[in-house]
Amino acid sequence: MATRHQVRQSVISLLYAFELNSQNNVFVDEILDEKKIRNEQKNFTLNLYNGILDNLNNIDETLNSFLNDNQITALGHVERAILRLGAYELLFTDTPSAIVINEAIELAKELANDNSPKFINGVLDALIKAKK
C-alpha cells in the first residue's frame, strides 16, 4: 500500500503531466498504475488532483499574492506543482499545516533544485500566517 507521501509524489507527477500534455487527462491511470497507487490511496490521490484542478484559478491567485517577484506561471513545473498541492491542502482540506509544510519541503528536496525547499517553505508559511 502506498504511503501518503507516495500519494503526494503521484499528485506532483499528475500535475506535471497535466501541464506538459496540454491539459489532457489520458495519462492519469497510467501514472497511478506505474506508481502502484490503488484503492483508498487512489481515491485520496484523485481527490487531491481533481480538487487542485477544480480550484486552480483560486489557488494560483492566492499563491501569486505571496510571490514577490514572480507569478506562479513563471516558476518551474515541479515547484509550481508542489506549491499548488500545498496551497490546496492548506486552503481546502483539514490536513494539519505542519504536515503540509513538511511534505512540501520533502517533495522539493526530492524533486526540485537546491533552493526550492526554502522558497516553498517561505511561500506556504506566508499563506498559513495570512490564513489565521
Swiss-Prot record:
The gene is nusB. InterPro entries: NusB-like_sf, NusB_fam, NusB_RsmB_TIM44. NCBIfam families: nusB (TIGR01951). Keywords: RNA-binding, Transcription, Transcription antitermination, Transcription regulation. Transmembrane segments: none annotated. One of its GO terms (biological process) is DNA-templated transcription termination. One of its GO terms (cellular component) is cytosol. HAMAP family: NusB. This is Transcription antitermination protein NusB.
